[in-house]
């Protein structure tokens, strides 16, 4: 994506005759500026892409690797990204003792965003290597069973269909048809259908995002989804700043 330039909010003095001052930035941008968002580094995530996306929408990303660093960050929001194998993602969280930190954060309904493996890790179990997840939400992570003409992994652009109306994460996005970027062979099957924030079709419907309170997760990569993905990070930063 192209990182938008955010002009300085500072003003200068001066006499009359000059050009009129620029209009103030949108309130959501003002609210998200200087908001610290912790980003968990589990060793297998696209850390740079996520932090750059947060910077692009005016937030201050803070990379954390331990519970102490998370506490010390005084972050208003938490992002758990991940790419690769779920076993490695969950294993790294447990080794760093961040698994309890994530569960505790979510239990308090603090602003949270899981991305790709960061979404899959929240469920009870995955068919990928028979992995036990964090158990935040009841449900499983299952492998695509699709016609031979549909390649696995599901890779590339696909369109969303939002199932929860009025979700703060979807502000500024169309209810249906927004294109986002996926790379995955497994998808989440929540036990509670009301958890599904958005669906996508790939030989059949699957869960593309979940939402409950101020806790969200996406199977797709907002940081790779250009303007629409930045809107999701902008919405999350505004939610964290509220």
Where do the PLM segments sit?
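Extreme N-terminal starter segment of soluble prokaryotic enzymes
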Residues: 34-38
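Intrinsically disordered, low-complexity regions enriched in glycine and serine
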Residues: 11-24
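Short, surface-exposed beta-strand/loop micro-motifs that present aromatic residues
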Residues: 204-211
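Short acidic low-complexity segments
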Residues: 62-73
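Acyltransferase
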Residues: 218-242
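Cysteine-nucleophile active-site neighborhood
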Residues: 83-157
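Short acidic/histidine-rich motifs immediately flanking catalytic phosphotransfer sites
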Residues: 72-80
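Pocket-forming structural segment of enzyme catalytic cores
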Residues: 124-202
């Amino acid at each position: 994506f192209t990182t938008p330039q955010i002009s300085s909010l500072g003003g200068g003095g001066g006499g009359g005759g000059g050009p009129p001052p620029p209009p103030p930035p949108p309130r959501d941008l003002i609210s998200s500026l200087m908001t610290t968002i912790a980003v968990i580094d589990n060793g297998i995530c696209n850390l740079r892409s996520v932090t750059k996306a947060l910077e692009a929408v005016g937030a201050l990303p803070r990379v954390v690797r331990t519970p102490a660093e998370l506490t010390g960050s005084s972050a208003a929001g938490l992002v758990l990204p991940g790419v690769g194998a779920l076993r490695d993602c969950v294993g790294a969280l447990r080794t760093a003792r961040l698994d309890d930190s994530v569960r505790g954060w979510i239990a308090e309904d603090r602003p949270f965003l899981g991305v790709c493996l960061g979404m899959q890790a929240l469920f009870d179990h995955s068919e990928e290597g028979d992995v036990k997840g964090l158990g935040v939400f009841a449900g499983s992570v299952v492998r695509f069973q699709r016609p031979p003409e549909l390649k696995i992994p599901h890779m590339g652009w696909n369109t969303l269909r939002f199932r929860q109306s009025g979700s703060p994460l979807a502000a500024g996005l169309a209810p249906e048809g927004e294109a986002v970027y996926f790379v995955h062979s497994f998808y989440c099957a929540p036990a509670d259908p009301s958890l599904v924030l958005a669906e996508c079709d790939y030989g059949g419907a699957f869960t593309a995002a979940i939402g409950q309170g101020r806790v969200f997760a996406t199977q797709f990569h907002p940081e790779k989804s250009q303007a629409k993905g930045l809107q999701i990070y902008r919405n999350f930063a505004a939610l964290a700043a509220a």
